[in-house]
A protein has these predicted regions:
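Histidine-centered active-site microenvironments of extracellular/periplasmic hydrolases
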Residues: 258, 444-491, 535-541
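C-terminal cap/loop subdomain of S1 sulfatases and analogous C-terminal strand-loop tails that border
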Residues: 462-466, 511-569, 573
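A long, amphipathic alpha-helix that forms part
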Residues: 197-199, 204, 219-228, 362-370, ...
Length: 602
């Protein structure tokens, strides 16, 4: 066997796997040659370094084992198998390449078994060890021709030439990898598996001319927004976002089970208002959170967006971010928050709880000093109770048995069904309501609620088996119909609470404070009546699936389109809240009108 055949065979397998990723996950064919280039340069660097080591050993009278290159190639293939497997998991789960940052962030939690995951420690060890043994067995059985081919090539190595080649090949590989790591915006590199694995924490705003234009306009707004506004109020502002919280499983929205006793008591007493039909702009956390803070559709958001907390800082507010979950691991969210040192506390910093345990928010609140006159504060509180990864407390088994738990590794193919079954979800809605009560209690004890406005909402909904499980892929009501609750001390009057979306939250808060709403914000204040609107919604994992909600007084329609595949659905949400009757063929004029409002993205 000639040695070039060994290398070409390895690269052929690599190219085939890269092509499979491009075909199955839409990662783009341009990433195939980039991936083959990285692996090929690694093979050459490995061979060149081994040649240099062989030449040095020969000078010293030492002979390396003839199977050395076979072992190194087997190790390379094993690492590739691990990388490909991690990326299959990540693409199936959240349609993104796996990164070392994510592995380091979530490995301790998964390994500990303290949070549910389809495969527990035993499964991880079994897969890792089994993969290694299988590859070792293959190379042991059919590796002798590789030894002969490598031996004939390595035997001709000369020290000076081998050393120079080793240095050159290592430098070339490092330079290529550096280009790949920095090529986040390149069609050839952004989906390449090796370089994307070593990128620093991700950031999910794809650059576009539209985003650059909005960012440039926001830079002017940031510089010119008034620091002092006559007649404005320095009320404390609290934004509570509960992950994966859908309105139709909340008692306060008419659900038959008592899942929200605290929130219901506030609404019943008149201290809290609710928007009847509220929707998230997106069915995934990243775009839901960023749209809420920036009052923008996702396609208009960038790291430089002028956001709610930026406006409030101009007014002298201290901004606090108390966040269940590991926000540092997901798409560079802290960069978007513009949080100053010490003001952001998330699951990666807790000393008492795992990263998806909402009790860590109370731990973070302990760090917040009591309110003082003339020092208004903004709080963004994120709770994970209703997310399928959110920790369920032992005392939170009301609609399920206390022994009805999900053990890692037991049922890998039904893990989402078991985590998301309605009884368990209702338990966790009740738990979230209890956590909100505790947040209110702590804020009240520190006098932040003496003069405050509080918003309680969800970042998106959650599929519970109606059509699918979990979130991120669809735009039906179970995916994007969320609560939107407003608590005011003293009370405020809202003339129209029939309809609202994420993008309305920030304008409403500024209007409540008597502050001007930036002209680039896309939402509407709920303090001002509105009868006719078109609102944009989209998925994050499937970037070309959109929805338009059309509200005209009491009428409410939803148009869902995936233009790339020609799929369209139209629903009358007043008559058909379960979205079972597609009206596209029955109401072509309305479908045509809403089709014109479908956004194709940046």
């Amino acid at each position: 066997m000639r040695f070039r055949r060994v290398l070409l065979g390895h690269l052929l397998v690599t190219a085939t796997i890269a092509a499979a990723f491009a075909w199955e996950f839409g990662s783009g064919v341009r990433a195939i040659p980039s991936h083959v280039l990285v692996v090929g340069e690694w093979d050459l660097a490995l061979l060149a370094v081994l040649s240099a080591v062989t030449a040095v050993a020969a000078r010293l009278g030492v002979r390396l084992p003839g199977q050395t290159y076979r072992y190194l190639l087997a190790a390379t293939c094993t690492l590739q198998a691990y990388l490909y497997t991690l990326n299959v998991v990540s693409h199936v789960s959240w349609d993104r390449n796996m990164t070392a940052h994510l592995v380091m962030a979530f490995a301790p939690t998964v390994w500990s078994g303290r949070e549910p995951f389809p495969v527990g420690p035993i499964g991880i060890v079994a897969f890792g060890g089994g993969t290694c043994l299988v590859i070792a067995a293959v190379f042991s059985r059919w590796g002798r021709p590789i030894d002969r081919a490598a031996g004939s090539w390595l035997g001709r190595s000369r020290l000076v030439r081998a050393a120079a080649l080793a240095v050159a090949s290592v430098v070339l590989f490092a330079a290529t990898l550096r280009v790949g790591i920095g090529g986040r915006d390149s069609l050839y590199w952004k989906q390449e598996l090796v370089s994307s694995f070593f990128r620093p924490e991700g950031f999910a705003f794809e650059p576009s001319a539209r985003r650059h234009a909005v960012a440039a306009h926001d830079a002017v707004l940031r510089a010119t927004y008034p620091a002092a506004v006559p007649g404005s109020h320095d009320k404390h502002v609290v934004l509570i976002i509960v992950d994966s919280l859908r309105a139709d499983h909340m008692q306060v929205y008419g659900y038959e089970r008592p899942t929200t006793p605290f929130l219901s008591s506030l609404v019943d007493s008149g201290r809290m208002n609710k928007v009847r039909d509220a929707f998230s702009t997106c069915s995934e956390s990243f775009c839901g959170i960023t749209s809420t803070l920036s009052s923008r559709e996702f396609q208009d958001i960038s790291a430089e967006t002028f956001q709610l907390q930026d406006v409030l800082r101009r007014k002298g507010y201290q901004a606090w971010f108390l966040l269940s979950g590991n926000h540092r691991a997901w798409n560079g969210l802290p960069r978007f928050y513009h949080a100053v040192d010490g003001a952001l506390f998330d699951g990666s910093q807790s000393e008492r709880y795992t990263m998806d345990d909402d009790r860590l928010v109370l731990e973070g609140l302990e760090r917040v000093p009591p309110a003082s006159p003339g020092h208004p504060a903004f709080f963004y509180v994120h709770l994970m109770s209703t997310h399928y990864l959110g920790v369920q407390f032992d005392e939170s088994h009301v609609f399920t048995r206390s022994d009805d738990r999900v053990s890692p590794g037991l049922e890998p193919y039904t893990i989402l069904e078991r985590l998301n079954k309605p009884d368990r979800y209702d338990d966790k809605v009740l738990q979230a309501d209890g956590m909100i009560r505790q947040v209110f209690t702590q804020l009240q004890a520190k006098h932040y609620l003496d003069d405050a406005v509080v918003v309680v909402t969800g970042d998106h909904g959650e599929g519970l088996g109606e059509r699918h499980w979990a979130h991120g892929w669809h735009l039906y009501n179970e995916d994007i119909r969320i609560p939107l609750l407003l608590y005011d001390a003293p009370p405020a009057r809202y003339p129209d609470l029939t309809f609202g979306t994420h993008v309305d939250i920030a304008p409403t808060l500024l209007d409540r404070l008597g502050l001007p709403i930036p002209d680039s914000w896309e939402g509407q204040s709920l303090l001002r009546p509105s009868t006719r609107r078109f609102t944009q919604h989209q998925t994050y994992f499937i970037p070309h699936r959109f929805a338009v909600l059309y509200r005209d007084r009491e009428a409410l329609f939803k148009f869902i389109a995936t233009p790339r595949y020609g799929n369209e659905e139209l629903f009358d949400l007043r008559k058909d809240p379960r979205e079972e009757h597609n009206l596209v063929s029955e109401q072509p004029a309305l479908a045509s009108l809403l089709r014109q409002h479908v956004s194709e993205g940046p």
